[in-house]
């Protein structure tokens, strides 16, 4: 089953990348501090035409030994469509697959490709059968901005939403 082997190989690669990212993220520069989640909240508290924010934006800052991370998130709804906007600070331990070469993969289930959003490296993924898409952006080699949409027909929804965000201003928080 060639398709099964290809899927298994992709899963193994994803696991390997994930594990290397976790190990890499545990090494924190001496004296470095994550941005407190309260500074990230305004970037997810956005007005999206046609969408309603569910509740209030929320966030967390965790510091335990050498592990430090901050995140802020906002959830939105428009009919049967849902959207989550997440910003994470891992002290520069951003998305590992964005540091390499250009990527483009298309199968009957999904499309994955590297791109640029507001001048920052990004990866977009769309699962057409599930009507689910993701846009992952590395901002200033410090922040991971993730837009996750469910019930969407294409990635244009996410691309339009990210235009409501001031990623260049977020980049100024990278000390």
Regions found by a protein language model. Give the residues of each.
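Bacterial N-terminal signal peptides that target proteins for export
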Residues: 1-18
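N-terminal non-cleavable signal-anchor helices
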Residues: 7-9, 28-31
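Short glycine-centered, acidic/aromatic-flanked micro-motifs in structured strand/loop junctions
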Residues: 11, 25, 149
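Generic anion/oxyanion-binding catalytic loop in active/binding sites
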Residues: 21, 40, 147
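C-terminal segment of classical bacterial N-terminal signal peptides
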Residues: 21-29
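Charge-dense, low-complexity intrinsically disordered segments
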Residues: 26, 38, 152
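Short, solvent-exposed recognition patches
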Residues: 34-128, 132
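A short, solvent-exposed beta-edge/loop patch
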Residues: 77, 82, 105-175
